[in-house]
């Protein structure tokens, strides 16, 4: 039986994370006294509602079987400031994605060694920064980002961008801020 304040299996979910506040010895119970739990379900539901609102406003129909990836570079808590939603529609010798930026959101500076990508602004507003030059994209505008080119983007009111590129490889995003590169839990 659990001891007082001990977390149990009922406290665990893929939408929860535990963090120790003190050292926990072998066979010691994980309790509210030596750790804390963060529940992410409500935040993830809020993000999903925000994304659905933008998709509805843009009148875009997505395939029913598509999975939404939440890219949260500095953690879910800072997602509304730094992050992006990614829907991968095709990833073969070529790749097609829809990238959704929420209002006020920044996608931090990065570059790719293997892939070249082109962005088409389909909805909203987007400022793309390429090698320290700001480009305020217009609806329907296409910008190509060559291999090795540092790029970041932001949106004031929210945006949907179609990305067409070479094959997406999970080891081909190199962020200028090393804290992001060291974060193994930046995708949900």
Predicted regions and their residues:
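Structured binding elements
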Residues: 119
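Extreme N-terminal basic, low-complexity initiation segments
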Residues: 2-9
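Double-stranded beta-helix
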Residues: 12, 154-188
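Conserved short histidine dyad/triad with adjacent acidic residue
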Residues: 97-113
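Short acidic-glycine-tyrosine-enriched beta hairpin
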Residues: 132-150
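A short, N-terminal "cap"/entry segment at the start of jelly-roll beta-barrel domains
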Residues: 12-94, 180, 186-188
